[in-house]
């Protein structure tokens, strides 16, 4: 979350809500009944943690409201009734969800105006394009989204329930095979950190395995114990391209290719040459080169393929939103409070597409 026109978000925190497992355990500590984001993360040992967003879709609106409240009042320290709000949504977000979102913004937070944009479209804008295909992969879900002249092509969007959380689980399993045990939620966070700091995508996994001893890295756990991580460094993200490792079907390159093949033959060339990676799970070093190699194998041989993996791709959805909402031409696009009062939540389908 942050402000239009800024080049990076002001607040970055996990979309989680925690409630104390046992009332009164923290007597005298001014215990709250709900913790959000980093506060919940750091106390997860004594909390029951909930994820209101599952596979990119909001499934618990009460918790989501708490997250927005925390964003406005604690993180950004703004009064929501004084600022128009641009929100982002997953591709294929159900219509009822968009309406509920609109209703909460206008009725609970009294915003003066709002707009809802598809995440992948904003990532494409952030890369300076209006046509291309975006592979957006976060913690809970991945999507391939072809976009033509600023419009997502719904018939060709594919969703893959393989993302950051699955890779963290897989790395936990690989490390357990090495004899290291990570079971509690706090230890899971350690694995996530190992993933972020040490994992990378190999261009050719067979070749990488021959270099093994040199690729070992050590990682110090919070208790001072040092563990060694070797082939796990590239075997973990390999699951993105080869989900058979997780007992799943096709990988991200095949999904991207299938998504392009669902599009009109005349625009495929533009999609192949404008393939944009976005989201935290696309941050592994080497992922751009590997994607280039995999797509080249799948595509017609004459096709020019360009994979774009910009350094700020973790926040490219947010950056695209910052760009869009600062444009003078965008100012007429907002849904105003008056329009909402007149037409109700369904106005979102007329104005945001």
Swiss-Prot record:
<dbReference type="Pfam" id="PF00022">
    <property type="entry name" value="Actin"/>
</dbReference>
<dbReference type="InterPro" id="IPR004001">
    <property type="entry name" value="Actin_CS"/>
</dbReference>
<comment type="function">
    <text>Actins are highly conserved proteins that are involved in various types of cell motility and are ubiquitously expressed in all eukaryotic cells.</text>
</comment>
<keyword id="KW-0067">ATP-binding</keyword>
<dbReference type="GO" id="GO:0005856">
    <property type="term" value="C:cytoskeleton"/>
</dbReference>
<dbReference type="GO" id="GO:0005524">
    <property type="term" value="F:ATP binding"/>
</dbReference>
<dbReference type="InterPro" id="IPR020902">
    <property type="entry name" value="Actin/actin-like_CS"/>
</dbReference>
<dbReference type="InterPro" id="IPR043129">
    <property type="entry name" value="ATPase_NBD"/>
</dbReference>
<comment type="similarity">
    <text>Belongs to the actin family.</text>
</comment>
<keyword id="KW-0963">Cytoplasm</keyword>
<comment type="function">
    <text>Essential component of cell cytoskeleton; plays an important role in cytoplasmic streaming, cell shape determination, cell division, organelle movement and extension growth.</text>
</comment>
<keyword id="KW-0378">Hydrolase</keyword>
<keyword id="KW-0547">Nucleotide-binding</keyword>
<dbReference type="GO" id="GO:0016787">
    <property type="term" value="F:hydrolase activity"/>
</dbReference>
<dbReference type="InterPro" id="IPR004000">
    <property type="entry name" value="Actin"/>
</dbReference>
<protein>
    <recommendedName>
        <fullName>Actin</fullName>
        <ecNumber>3.6.4.-</ecNumber>
    </recommendedName>
</protein>
<keyword id="KW-0206">Cytoskeleton</keyword>
<dbReference type="GO" id="GO:0005737">
    <property type="term" value="C:cytoplasm"/>
</dbReference>
């Amino acid at each position: 979350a942050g402000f239009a026109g800024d080049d990076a978000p002001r607040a970055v925190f996990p979309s989680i809500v925690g409630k104390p497992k046992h009332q009164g355990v923290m007597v005298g500590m001014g215990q709250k009944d709900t913790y959000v984001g980093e506060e919940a993360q750091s106390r997860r040992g004594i909390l029951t943690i909930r994820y209101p967003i599952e596979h990119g879709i909001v499934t618990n609106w009460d918790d989501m409201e708490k997250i927005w409240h925390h964003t406005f009042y604690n993180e950004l320290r703004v009064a929501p009734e004084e600022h128009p709000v641009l929100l982002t949504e997953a591709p294929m977000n159900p219509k009822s969800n968009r309406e509920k979102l609109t209703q909460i913004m206008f009725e609970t937070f009294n915003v003066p105006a709002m707009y809802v944009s598809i995440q992948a479209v904003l990532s494409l804008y952030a890369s300076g394009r209006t046509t291309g295909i975006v592979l957006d992969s976060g913690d809970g879900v991945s999507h391939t989204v072809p976009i033509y002249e600023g419009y997502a092509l719904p018939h060709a969007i594919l969703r893959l329930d393989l993302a950051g959380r699955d890779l963290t689980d897989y790395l936990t399993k690989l490390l357990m095979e090495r004899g290291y045990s990570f079971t509690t939620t706090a230890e899971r966070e350690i694995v996530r950190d190992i993933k972020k700091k040490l994992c990378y995508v190999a261009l050719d996994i067979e070749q990488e395995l021959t270099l093994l001893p040199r690729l070992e890295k050590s990682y110090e756990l919070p208790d001072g114990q040092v563990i060694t991580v070797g082939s796990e460094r590239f075997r973990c993200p390999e699951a993105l391209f080869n989900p058979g490792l997780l007992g799943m079907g096709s990988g991200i390159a095949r999904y991207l290719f299938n998504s392009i093949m669902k599009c009109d033959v005349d625009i495929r060339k533009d999609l192949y040459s404008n393939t944009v990676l976005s989201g935290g799970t696309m941050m592994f070093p080497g992922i751009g080169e590997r994607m280039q190699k995999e797509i080249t194998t799948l595509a017609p041989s004459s096709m020019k393929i360009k994979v774009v993996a910009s350094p700020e791709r973790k926040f490219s959805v947010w950056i695209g939103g910052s760009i869009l909402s600062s444009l003078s031409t965008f100012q007429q696009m907002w849904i105003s409070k008056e329009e909402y009062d007149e037409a109700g939540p369904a106005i979102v389908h007329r104005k945001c597409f």
